[in-house]
Amino acid sequence: MTTIVSVRRNNQVVIAGDGQVSLGNTVMKGNAKKVRRLYHNKVLAGFAGGTADAFTLFERFEAKLEMHQGHLLRSAVELAKDWRTDRMLRKLEAMLVVADAEASLIITGNGDVVQPEYDLVAIGSGGNYAQAAALALLQNTELSALEIAEKSLTIAGDICVFTNQFKTIEELNY
């Protein structure tokens, strides 16, 4: 699996991900980029799950963003509708975290769209560790969103065997 974490604070949103690709108990690659910029660099997206499945979802989500002029929530809901009705999409095993200047969302493997409660989202095998670390840092420090995302991903990588210390970090300032 992997760990993807998104943190929003003080007009900044960040999505960070590790680089480990595992096949069973074997590390196949350590420097995969699981975080990308979409729609004219105005949307950030990260994935956890099967790599090929995630690329399919990235392509579909980017098409929805183009169709809906970059409106994040509408694009996510339309992708979720497709996910529930398209046989091929229903077999994909991946989750997306997407964010723009206004919202952060999780698009789940069941075709659900969830907006987080605390301006932070974490998915993947190390997601719970990253989320706990990020929430503690959000509530008890004045660190930036970038610093919180980086530190929480480091903590997840120290605990989760399917998460490494190679980081891809993208940020939007608005």
Curated annotation (Swiss-Prot):
Paired cysteines (S-S): none
Catalytic class of the enzyme: hydrolase
Main location as per UniProt: cytoplasm
Gene designation: hslV
Regulation: Allosterically activated by HslU binding.
UniProt-listed PROSITE patterns: PROTEASOME_BETA_2
Subunit architecture: A double ring-shaped homohexamer of HslV is capped on each side by a ring-shaped HslU homohexamer. The assembly of the HslU/HslV complex is dependent on binding of ATP.
Stated name of the protein: ATP-dependent protease subunit HslV
Family annotation (CDD domains): protease_HslV
Organism: Shewanella putrefaciens (strain CN-32 / ATCC BAA-453)
Database matches in Gene3D superfamilies: Glutamine Phosphoribosylpyrophosphate, subunit 1, domain 1
Transmembrane segments: none
Record family assignment: Belongs to the peptidase T1B family. HslV subfamily.
Binding site for Na(+): 157, 160, 163
Xref: Pfam families: Proteasome
A GO CC term attached to the entry: HslUV protease complex
Residues in the signal sequence: none
